[in-house]
């Protein structure tokens, strides 16, 4: 229905993608607190370009401090510990669980995938999810860790 876009200066993935400065994040937090309160925006509705258009956008990317913002109630983050996820990374899952992963993503606000380019779009959607919720490894593969995180988020 309505949206507010906030651009944060960063060269991006094509031009030496760099960390966001503490000054940028401080200003962003201050602005988000104001906007969320003034417009009664739910923290689950704070999204990045790649969450909305994963087939063509990569920003804000894996160096964006989503977890840090979530600690202040400014966006969502999963509640799983490193211990919960420790042995799940790179563990393949059967295809039927990929559908569960996609349903979980739909529940948390990502668009569903359709059309001839299903495999390509699945990879891009998964990479967008990983850039936000599993920033240490962005490979576009739906593994057990991605499934666990998506399941956890779908229940928040």
Q: Predicted segment positions?
A:
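Oxyanion-hole/transition-state-stabilizing segment in secreted/luminal serine hydrolases
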Residues: 8-16
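Acidic, glycine-anchored loop motifs typical of Ca2+
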Residues: 116, 139-140
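Basic/polar, cationic surfaces and motifs that engage anionic cell-wall
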Residues: 17-113, 124, 128, 145-148
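Secretory-pathway/luminal and periplasmic proteins that interact with or process carbohydrate-rich
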Residues: 55-60, 132-139, 156
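Short coil-to-beta-strand
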Residues: 1-8
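Flexible, substrate/cofactor-facing loop regions flanked by secondary structure
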Residues: 113-117, 132
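C-terminal accessory extensions appended to soluble enzyme cores
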Residues: 131, 144-156
């Amino acid at each position: 229905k309505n949206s507010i876009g906030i651009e944060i200066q960063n060269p991006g993935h094509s031009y030496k993608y760099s960390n966001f400065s503490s000054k940028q994040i401080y200003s962003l937090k201050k602005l988000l607190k104001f906007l969320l309160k003034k417009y009664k925006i739910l923290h689950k509705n704070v999204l990045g370009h790649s969450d909305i258009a994963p087939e063509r956008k990569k920003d804000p990317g894996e160096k964006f401090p989503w977890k840090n913002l979530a600690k202040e109630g400014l966006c969502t983050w999963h509640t799983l510990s490193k211990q919960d996820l420790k042995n799940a990374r790179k563990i393949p899952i059967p295809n039927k669980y990929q559908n569960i992963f996609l349903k979980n993503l739909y529940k948390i606000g990502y668009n569903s995938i359709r059309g001839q380019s299903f495999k390509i779009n699945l990879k891009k959607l998964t990479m967008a999810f990983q850039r936000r919720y599993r920033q240490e490894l962005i490979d576009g593969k739906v593994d057990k860790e991605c499934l666990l995180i998506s399941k956890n988020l779908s229940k928040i």
